[in-house]
């Protein structure tokens, strides 16, 4: 009988963990809408190089961080934008200024991209095949206390354990 009770307790504990994991997993989903599947020229190096508008649905977090990567770059993943400490907004407006600290149209801190510049730098792949650009949005449980010039690795380390929600959208660009 004692073995049965222990086994029953173990099954109940496993079931409880599975239910909790399911709740956490479903809570993490954000719907991210760029309004396009191909990056417009205005948001690329050949155009005005403006960060695109990003709509975020299902947001229930204290702050946001956004990382935009080209996963098809020849040598390694190429980061086009890192922005963090954004108040939770359903709409990130287009054309964010390329300043380290932004005060308008919203407050945020931007990091350097793989070009070595602060702020958004649009797609600029070599001519040929299209590249895929992932816009990853992280809903965090707090504003991150980081040096304004923190590296990507420092940002990712600071986000560990604080991501409540996440979502992504992918768009392509070809020259």
What are these regions (language model features)?
Residues 5, 9, 15-175:
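N-terminus-centered regions that define maturation/targeting leaders and the start
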């Amino acid at each position: 009988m004692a073995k049965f009770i222990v086994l029953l307790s173990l099954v109940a504990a496993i079931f409880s963990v599975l239910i909790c994991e399911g709740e956490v997993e479903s809570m993490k989903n954000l719907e991210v809408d760029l309004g396009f599947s191909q990056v417009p020229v205005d948001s690329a190096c050949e155009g005005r190089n403006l960060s695109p508008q990003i709509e975020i649905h299902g947001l229930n977090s204290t702050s946001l961080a956004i990382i935009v990567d080209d996963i098809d770059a020849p040598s390694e993943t190429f980061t086009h934008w890192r922005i963090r400490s954004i108040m939770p907004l359903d709409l990130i407006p287009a054309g964010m200024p390329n300043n380290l600290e932004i005060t308008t149209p919203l407050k945020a801190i931007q990091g350097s991209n793989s070009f070595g510049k602060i702020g958004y730098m649009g797609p600029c792949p070599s001519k040929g095949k299209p590249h895929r650009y992932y816009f990853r949005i992280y809903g965090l449980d707090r504003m991150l206390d980081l040096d304004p010039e923190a590296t990507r690795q420092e940002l990712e380390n600071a986000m560990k354990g604080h991501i409540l929600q996440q979502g992504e959208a992918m768009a392509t660009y070809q020259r």
